[in-house]
Amino acid sequence: MSLSRPDFLALCEQHGLGQHADALHRQLRPRIRYHRTDAPDVPPGGSRIGGGPDVPSDFEWPMHNGRALDFLLQLNLADLQGFACAPALPAHGTLAFFYDVQEQPWGFDPADRTGHRVYWFEGVDLQQWDAPDAETAF
């Protein structure tokens, strides 16, 4: 769903934000919203949230402070073509997102740099992996 400018301004007015509507509207950016489905089988490299990531056979699982990062989601970039945000991204390949959900680093501290990772896989055979056991991750 996308709101037209008049609809957005009316919504702001309805919720008591009319005096801020123009400033809020300038902050809007294109976005894509994902919805959970019960799709049984996602092909390798397909878009999905959770589960195990599809990665190359020589992939080294990302770590932070001795712990394996958690896999969040992967996006097939071909699925994003036609959306307003697509020109800012490659037209093909898979993005895989990892994050330390236990420590939840914000990234302000340079020591937090390893607390999140985004990988772009292009033109390689991908296979689904499970997260390493905490005991064998070291």
Regions found by a protein language model. Give the residues of each.
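An N-terminus-focused feature that recognizes amino-terminal "leader" regions
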Residues: 1-94
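Hydrophobic, ordered structural segments
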Residues: 81-138
